Amino acid sequence: MVFPKLIWMGFFCHLCRGYFDGPLYPEMSNGTLHHYFVPDGDYEENDDPEKCQLLFRVSDRRRCSQGEGGQASSLLSLTLREEFTVLGRQVEDAGRVLEGISKSISYDLDGEESYGKYLRRESHQIGDAYSNSDKSLTELESKFKQGQEQDSRQESRLNEDFLGMLVHTRSLLKETLDISVGLRDKYELLAHTIRSHGTRLGRLKSDYLEGGAQKTG
């Protein structure tokens, strides 16, 4: 009879290995819905939350009460009231977390009543910004085209002025050449006239000298 009792006691102890069977120590929270407890009662920054995390069940039965350590474990086990106290603290923490989430959502909504209204307002703002940017781009393209047209007209005007100056210079050059040709012709005519007059003067001089010699003889 002793051997079966030992087997059942070992089985129940094995089942209770994953549950807390000691007193309630000071607790710490990481800001979420989870609660952690400091085993040594002194919270430090290097305490590992995974090692401090404990599991509670709402039950009035005592855990691991068989065997020689039954009395000590019964003194250290949590009562139903204590477990409800722990659950109440967890609910309070959950309420604080939900309140923080609600405040975060209200900050995100920026005064709007719902995400739908907030998204509609954001979409309107984005649409207005897009319309303004599209309008600005259209005005910029129009100014760019006007600048290109003005540059084209100015370039065309410069080309016309240059061609006009070139035609005028060509006409002046032609006129100058014509004048120079005319002057050359006049110069040749004048030279021919002077030579002709020189020839006539030479002949008259010879005739005069011959006539004077005959009279003297």
Swiss-Prot record:
Domain of life from the UniProt record: Eukaryota
Q: What is its main location?
A: secreted
- What does the entry list under GO cellular component? endoplasmic reticulum; extracellular region; Golgi apparatus
Question: Where is the secretion signal located?
Answer: 1-18
Give its localization: Secreted; Golgi apparatus; Endoplasmic reticulum
| Sugar attachment sites | 30
Q: Which UniProt keywords apply?
A: Disulfide bond, Endoplasmic reticulum, Glycoprotein, Golgi apparatus, Secreted, Signal
Show the GO MF annotations: protein homodimerization activity
| Family affiliation | Belongs to the FIBIN family.
Q: What is known about its subunit structure?
A: Homodimer; disulfide-linked. Seems to also exist as monomers.
Under what name is this protein listed? Fin bud initiation factor homolog
Q: Which organism is it from?
A: Mus musculus
